[in-house]
Each structure stands twice: as structure tokens, then as C-alpha cells.
Amino acid sequence: MKAVGMVVEYNPFHNGHRYHLQQAKKISEADVTVAVMSGNFTQRGEPTIVDKWSRARAAVMNGVDLVIELPLFYAVQPAHRFAGGALSLLNALGVDSIVFGSEHPEWDFARLVKAEEAFNQESFNKYNATYATQFNQQLKEQTGVTLIDPNDILAFAYTKAKINQGYHFELLPIKRQGSNYHDQQIKGKIASASAIRQAISEKGDYRQAVPQVMGDILATIKSIPLWTELYPLLRNQLIQAPVSTLQSTYLMAEGLEYRMKEAAQRSLDFNSFMKFTKTKRYTYAHLLRVCLYTILQITQEEVEKHSKHPYLHVLAFNKQGREYLHEVKKELALPLITKVDQEMRDQLLNLDYRAGKLYQLFTPVEQDLKHPPIIIN
């Protein structure tokens, strides 16, 4: 069977995602679609609007054949690690192509990757600018191009991962449809995920922008999971933990632990905390990721250890997806997981399990232990 892969968050699954899926099937001429999807926390480190099982269900009911979870140690990362991890799973699953959205699909991303080789990496040490800002300054000098739009940044990261790892699948960019990624208003049937989340938080009308299945799921949520609700746990951890413990937290560097600890002591709410912590050196997304790893007490050592042992955690599939798994199962180089037992909880999937337990503050649904895949016939 010919397979096409997609890297997704589906936060939530909307009509733009359905268009992406339809185009992926069309231009790849694939028999089966495989989506590698972030779990309960996004690349930016934010809790998803509904849990991973609900999003996987909506995806399969709208035509995705197989949904695999992107482990936390790949999912909550800067673009290059997020993309590299996702592509490694799709490569392990034997996909023939990967289709992704881009604001500028006509760009030669391989040329941009090649241009990066000439960068002066030693100059990326300015503390008054983020890495992304310094990267774009050099990229513009070399090529005249700047990577600003989120999907273009990921397109660059996918291309770089493919080149560096020597993957043989084909990368097929398509033009992103509808609203801008950051648009906060719903203006038609295709809207950005952030606009849909905004409409839900304001009790506005979003149903025209999502398929019925996703709309029905969203109608059941009482409130949107937000960092404002997690902040008391984060604040307690930052105040109580010694600096030496905070220093070992994944992504914590350059004395950020001192700044976050002081911010927690001064700030009673999350917005004030972030305002105090934010500097020109770090993006908001980077700080959110550090906050998540802090609250989960995940260390640099743990991420390094677990990322050496990736796996394929099946969230949902249909008949076509089941047939594809049966076809590739014997050739898989990574463990295929369909139900998490206690040994997996304590070892292989421990980071995802901890993230799932944190997410259960927003939902009564068990997120990992003994949860079987969703099967849509």
C-alpha cells in the first residue's frame, strides 16, 4: 500500500485540516493516510483544547486512516526537533511521501537549508535577540528570504531533517488555505485554529469552520484548558524547588531558573509571571515549553534518555489503517504500542504518562494506562 504522511496537531481539527487531508490524498495518490499527531500539549507547550483521543477520533472520522502519537519529547520542542522527531516516526512507518502546508510552497527550501551551512553560528550568542531573529538576519543576508510564517518554518525544518537523515520519502508542500495562522476572527468555512479557539472561549459561533464531529466534541467542553489554571502548580514548584533542581529541568539554561523563581515569588497570576519572565532572548513559546517541563519535573537527562528510544503509540485507525499496520508491522524498527501497561507507564512512555496525568486536571478520561486505540469502522 502506498502511504502519505502528515505532521499535525489538530487543535482542533477544522475544515482547513480536512482540505489538507484531501489534497494529500490527491497529489500523493496514496492508498492510506498516516498522521503523526501531538498528544495533549502542543509544540508551543500549551494544553490542547480537547484531549488526544477526541482529536484522533475526529481525524479518523474525517478520513485519516491512522493516527500515531508524537511523543512529548518530540512534540514540545522548537521547530527543528519537532520536525525531526515527527519525520523519524513517519520514516519508520514506511510512508512514501509527506504533505504539509506552507505559506510559500514555491520556495526552494533545500536551497535555504544549503545557505544555512554558511552561517556564522558563533554570532548567535546575542542576549538581546532570540535565536530565530538572529537566524533570519543571516538567512536574509544569504538568500533575501526570511522565515516568519509558522508553516514555512516547519517546511524548512522538514526539508533539513530529510536532507540530514537521508530519508527517501518525497516532501510535497501545498499552499496553506484560508485565514492567516494568527488570525483571531472566523470569516468563512476555513479559519485558523487560534480563531476557532478564540471563538470558543468567547462563546462565539465556530461551527461553520469545523466538521460536525469536531463541533459536537467541542460543544461538550465546559472550559478551554489554559495555563492560567496550571499556574498554581507551576508557581508552587518554582518556589519550593531548590535552584539546583530547577537547573536540571529540560530547556532550562543561562540562569533562567533564577528569573523564573523570582517571577513566581512576585506574581500571583500567570500573565504577570510571563510578563516578568519574558526577555528579548526568549520567545513566548520557548518559555511555555520550559514551564511545562518544569511543572512535569522532566530533566535534561530524562529527555536525552527517552528520545533515544522512540515508539509508535497508536491512537486511532479505520479498516484501511488496520490493514496498513498489518502490512508494515513485521518490518517496523520501533516498538508498536496499542495499549499502555504498567511497565510501559513506568519506563518507555513515562514522560507521556506524566503529561497525561497533568492534562487530567481538565478531563476525567484516563489518558494512557490501558487505553485502547479508537477503531472507526
From Swiss-Prot:
This is tRNA(Met) cytidine acetate ligase. Belongs to the TmcAL family. It is an enzyme of class 6 (ligase). ATP binds at residues 7-20, 101, 151, 176. The gene is tmcAL. It catalyses: cytidine(34) in elongator tRNA(Met) + acetate + ATP = N(4)-acetylcytidine(34) in elongator tRNA(Met) + AMP + diphosphate. Its EC number is 6.3.4.-. The lineage of its organism: Bacteria, Bacillati, Bacillota, Bacilli, Lactobacillales. Keywords: ATP-binding, Cytoplasm, Ligase, Nucleotide-binding, RNA-binding, tRNA processing, tRNA-binding. One of its GO terms (molecular function) is ligase activity, forming carbon-nitrogen bonds. GO terms for cellular component: cytoplasm. One of its GO terms (biological process) is tRNA modification. Its main location: cytoplasm. Catalyzes the formation of N(4)-acetylcytidine (ac(4)C) at the wobble position of elongator tRNA(Met), using acetate and ATP as substrates. First activates an acetate ion to form acetyladenylate (Ac-AMP) and then transfers the acetyl group to tRNA to form ac(4)C34. It is found in: Cytoplasm. It comes from Limosilactobacillus reuteri (strain DSM 20016). InterPro entries: Rossmann-like_a/b/a_fold, tRNA(Met)_cyd_acetate_ligase.
